[in-house]
A protein has these predicted regions:
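Short catalytic helix/loop segments, enriched in acidic residues and glycine
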Residues: 29-44
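Conserved N-proximal alpha/beta basic substrate-recognition cap immediately N-terminal to
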Residues: 51-159, 166-170
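Short, Lys/Arg-enriched N-terminal segments with co-localized hydrophobic residues
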Residues: 1-6
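ATP-grasp fold ATP-binding core
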Residues: 137, 168-194, 213-223, 228, ...
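ATP-dependent carboxylate/phosphate-activation module, predominantly the ATP-grasp catalytic core
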Residues: 219-225, 229-275
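Short glycine-rich anion-binding loops that position phosphate/pyrophosphate groups of nucleotides
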Residues: 20-22, 96-99, 184-186
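Nucleotide-activated donor-dependent transferases that construct or modify glycoconjugates
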Residues: 10-30
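Short beta-strand-to-turn element immediately C-terminal to the catalytic PLP-Schiff-base lysine
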Residues: 149, 192-197, 231-233
Length: 275
C-alpha cells in the first residue's frame, strides 16, 4: 500500500493541510480543535486521493488512511509551500487569520497556479481586515458605526477617540453607551477593549495597541455572539449552520472560550438571509 501511495501523481492528488498540525503546534488550547478539523476533513475526503502535509509527530496517526500520501515535515510550513507548491494542481487547507496566515498561504498557492477550494487571496485580505470588511459591506448589511484610527506616537489618537465617543453619545444621551476598540487584524477577541466611560481611556492603551498600529472603534452592541458557517462560490452563498460563540468579558477585556454548533435560535432565518 505504501508504495502505491508514494507513486501517486501529484496532478491526481489534492494537497491538504491544517496550519497548526503542519506547524508542530503543541498548545492544547489550539491543537485539540486543529486535530479535529484536519482528521474530519480526511474522513470527508475518503473517496479522493490526498497528499497530506503534517508535522512528523503525527506519523503514527495517519497510517489508517489508505487514500492519503503523508508528507511529514519538520520545517516551517510557509517555507515548505514556497518550495513545493508548484508540484500540485489542487489544494484544500485550513488556517486561522492570525498574522495574515490565511492570506499568505492563499497567495503562495495562487502564485503557483494551484487551484484552491478555499477563498481567494483577495477575499482573505478583505475578511482578515475588519475595516476592509466594514467598507465592503457598507450599505449592504446592517453594521455598527465604525471608525479607523491610527495610534500615533504623539498621542493624538486619545483626543480622536474622546471626540468620537462624545459625538456618538450625544446622539442618544439617555441610553447606556459603550464603544469597543479592536485591532484591524486579529481573531478570537484578541486584544479587544470595551469602554463604558470615556474617562477610562488612558495612554495605557498603547500597551495593547503599540504606536503605529491602527485600530477599529465601534459601537458596542449588546447581545448573543453568533456566526454563520456557509459555502460560497463568489456570487451565491449557502448557509450551513448557525453557531454560538462563548466570549467572556472581564475587566473590560474579551476572551474567546469556544463555541457550540449548531445553535438554535428564533432568529436563525434572519441570520441565514443572503444579499
Amino acid at each position: 500500500m505504501g508504495w502505491c501511495l508514494l507513486m501517486m501523481s501529484n496532478e491526481d492528488s489534492i494537497l491538504i493541510f491544517e496550519y497548526f498540525t503542519a506547524s508542530g503546534e503543541k498548545d492544547k488550547c489550539i491543537i485539540s480543535e486543529a486535530e479535529a478539523l484536519i482528521f474530519n476533513l480526511l474522513d470527508d475526503l475518503k473517496d479522493y486521493n490526498l497528499t497530506l502535509v503534517i508535522d512528523k509527530s503525527y506519523e503514527d496517526l495517519i497510517g489508517e488512511y489508505e487514500n492519503v500520501n503523508p508528507i511529514l515535515i519538520e520545517e516551517n510550513l510557509i517555507d515548505w509551500l514556497e518550495n513545493n507548491a508548484t508540484k500540485y494542481k489542487k489544494a484544500i487547507f485550513i488556517a486561522a487569520e492570525n498574522d495574515n496566515n490565511l492570506y499568505n498561504i492563499s497567495k503562495i498557492l495562487e502564485d503557483n497556479n494551484v487551484e484552491t477550494y478555499n477563498s481567494s487571496a483577495e477575499a482573505c485580505s478583505i475578511s482578515s481586515n475588519k475595516f476592509k470588511t466594514y467598507e465592503s459591506l457598507f450599505n449592504i448589511v446592517p453594521q455598527p458605526r465604525s471608525f479607523k484610527i491610527k495610534i500615533d506616537p504623539k498621542g493624538y489618537w486619545k483626543r480622536a477617540i474622546d471626540n468620537l465617543y462624545k459625538k456618538w453619545k450625544s446622539e442618544d444621551p439617555l441610553s447606556s453607551f459603550k464603544i469597543i476598540l479592536k485591532p484591524l487584524n486579529g481573531v478570537d477577541c484578541e486584544d479587544i477593549v470595551i469602554l463604558e466611560d470615556i474617562d477610562d481611556l488612558s495612554y495605557d492603551l498603547e500597551k495593547i495597541f503599540p504606536p503605529g498600529s491602527r485600530i477599529l472603534v465601534q459601537d458596542y452592541i449588546e447581545g448573543i455572539d453568533v456566526s454563520v458557517s456557509l459555502l460560497c462560490d463568489g456570487r451565491n452563498a449557502i448557509p450551513i449552520c448557525l453557531n454560538e460563540q462563548f466570549v467572556e468579558l472581564k475587566n473590560d477585556r474579551g476572551t474567546y472560550l469556544g463555541g457550540r454548533s449548531p445553535f438554535t435560535s428564533k432568529h436563525k432565518d434572519e441570520a441565514f438571509q443572503t444579499h
